[in-house]
């Protein structure tokens, strides 16, 4: 799986849960 896709952990959007769209850490999802 692509490294930017994170599941069931603190994702790039700063919340715990399933990964959002592989966004940049500076963007809101």
UniProtKB/Swiss-Prot annotation:
Glycosylation sites: 7, 9
Chain positions found as N-acetylalanine: 1
Chief place where the protein resides: secreted
Keyword tags: Acetylation, Amidation, Disulfide bond, Glycoprotein, Hydroxylation, Ion channel impairing toxin, Neurotoxin, Secreted, Toxin
PTM comment: O-linked glycans consist of Hex4-HexNAc2 hexasaccharides. N-terminus is found to be free and N-acetylated, depending on the fraction studied.
A GO molecular-function descriptor: ion channel regulator activity
Sites of 4-hydroxyproline modification: 2, 18, 22
Family in the record: Belongs to the conotoxin A superfamily.
Name listed for the protein in its UniProt record: Conotoxin SIVC
Organism of provenance: Conus striatus (Striated cone)
């Amino acid at each position: 799986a692509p490294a930017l896709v994170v599941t069931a952990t603190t994702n790039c959007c700063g919340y715990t849960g399933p990964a959002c769209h592989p966004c940049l850490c500076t963007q809101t999802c």
